[in-house]
Design a protein with these regions (language model features):
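Conserved catalytic network of the ASCE P-loop NTPase/AAA+ motor domain
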Residues: 26-27, 54-57, 143-149, 189-196, ...
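Conserved nucleotide-binding/hydrolysis micro-motifs of P-loop NTPases
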Residues: 68-71, 160-161, 205-210, 233-237, ...
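Sensor-1/coupling segment of RecA-like P-loop NTPase cores
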Residues: 146-155, 161-163, 171-215
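Conserved small helical "lid"/interfacial subdomain of P-loop NTPases
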Residues: 228-256, 275
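Winged-helix-like regulatory helical subdomains adjacent to P-loop NTPase cores
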Residues: 254, 263-364
Length: 370
């Protein structure tokens, strides 16, 4: 196993979550999955491991990242781009016919109708020819691949960011468009012939659950199996660090590894890898020092300017998915909780929130807090 802190891991570098991959694969036999959690907890690594497993079971699997998409056509473009190489595979049955049909659908994608921000219910035609509603074209794309013999897994990364982009860029109809997107996914897709051949793994580093609750559309995701990635147990985290140390010939006892886990406090693989990276660097600079004597310095390096970008990113996500006022409230509560390693009691957080919200009643503050 290699010391990789940041990039998704595969093969021998994937450690400690084999049982989770097996459980997700089992769920996908009958249900679609919503996998949410902050950045750097291994969602992409797990999703790709699931893709590998279902392929071994005879499925086809594609991955699309929609974080850069600002509208529904962007989603369709990503879907088409991911399908093209998969359908050009020589092992695909009737690939030529399906590929030709996909090409025709690609031309339709260029002319789908999407709402024009600020224009109310009016749409805009993109490209030449008659414009269609994007949901019709999307449904035809999915129906096309469902005609093939194999089952399909479509892994969509950062879908919540696309939906937040719709709302941010279209203050007039953005919420309606998000509702339509999620209704299409829940109802239209499931109603397609052979829909059982299509399974979806949706992931994101911002809260889709938060978005739908805020806008009164929680029902749109109730058909998804909600899953998360818990941190490693102490035993698994220690085993990972000891294996890493063996790879790099660094003397590290189980006790030393346990001290690292205790210092990290939230032993997600990334933070263990990042701490080990800094520990390796310090050992290289101080070859006579023991690993145990350098653990505290390695932890300090995690939060030094330039190395703490991931923590700033979390703060940015709050601003992205919450209103300015609610994001400020959230930061205030986090600052209060961070004063003590054991956190803060809900009553203390609620009292601080009531003070910040001024004229709000206790019940209004409680609803915001929840």
């Amino acid at each position: 196993m290699h010391n990789i802190a940041g990039s998704p891991v595969e093969g021998e570098d994937f450690f400690g979550r084999e049982s989770i991959v097996a459980r997700l694969q089992e769920i996908l036999a009958n249900d679609d999955i919503l996998l949410l959690g902050p950045r750097r907890i291994g969602k992409t690594s797990v999703a790709r491991a699931v893709m590998k497993q279902v392929r071994a079971a005879g499925w086809r699997a594609i991955e699309i990242n929609v974080a850069s998409c600002v509208d529904e056509r962007g989603f369709l473009d990503k879907l088409e781009a991911a399908l093209k190489p998969e359908l050009s595979s020589p092992t695909a049955r009737a690939a030529d016919a399906v590929g030709d049909a996909l090409g025709a659908l690609g031309r339709r994608i260029k002319s789908v109708k999407i709402p024009l921000p600020g224009a109310g219910s009016f749409g805009v035609e993109l490209g030449e020819g008659g414009a269609e509603d994007w949901t019709q074209v999307a449904g035809d794309v999915l129906q096309l691949i469902a005609q093939m013999e194999e089952r399909w897994l479509i892994y969509v990364d950062e879908l919540p960011i696309l939906l937040f982009n719709l709302i941010r860029n279209d203050s007039e109809t953005g919420v309606q468009r998000v509702r339509r997107f999620l209704d299409w996914f829940r109802n239209d897709v499931r109603a397609l012939p052979d829909a059982r051949k299509l399974r979806w793994l949706i992931s994101g580093s911002v809260g889709l659950d938060t978005l739908v609750q805020e806008h009164g559309m929680a029902d749109t995701i109730n058909s998804l199996s909600h899953q998360g990635l818990e941190p490693f147990s102490t035993e698994v985290a220690v085993a990972m660090l000891v294996e890493l140390a063996g790879q790099y010939r660094i003397p590290l006892s189980d006790g030393d590894a346990g001290s690292i886990v205790a210092a990290v406090q939230w032993p997600q693989p990334y933070y263990l890898q990042a701490t080990f990276h800094h520990l390796r660097s310090l050992i290289g600079a101080k070859p006579g020092a023991s690993a145990a004597s350098l653990i505290e310095q390695a932890m300090d390096r995690l939060v030094q300017p330039g190395a703490d970008n991931d923590f700033h990113h979390w703060q940015g996500r709050l601003s992205q998915q919450l209103s300015r006022a609610d994001a400020d409230h959230a930061l205030a509560m986090l600052n209060l909780a961070a004063r003590d390693p054991s956190g803060a009691r809900p009553e203390s957080l609620l009292a601080a929130l009531e003070e910040r919200m001024g004229e709000a009643t206790t019940e209004e503050a409680r609803r915001t807090f929840i």
